[in-house]
């Protein structure tokens, strides 16, 4: 997320619906459907950015993007929802900094809980390395 999130962990509970300005864009609106996003900080990069782990209680279209934008912390690279393009350019990002490291769901046929994991793709690993170089951890 762009900027420094104040809390180490929090929940965003805000309804999401279609934005009137676009067929593709969504926003927090009282007329929207319920949406709940839980998050934990995994790494901080000064006030420039914050790496978070997200757990969705609901699955609305663009939920992560809309919820973080609504609290003033859009995803890096997500200009549709207010990200400053300078950080993306600095990191060489050509997309939103969004990746599912782990998904858990009940298999539709077997009904068994299934977990799928994935590493960060190369472009996000490079961006993460650049952020760590720009913001070394303090001992």
What are these regions (language model features)?
Residues 1-139:
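RNA pseudouridine synthases
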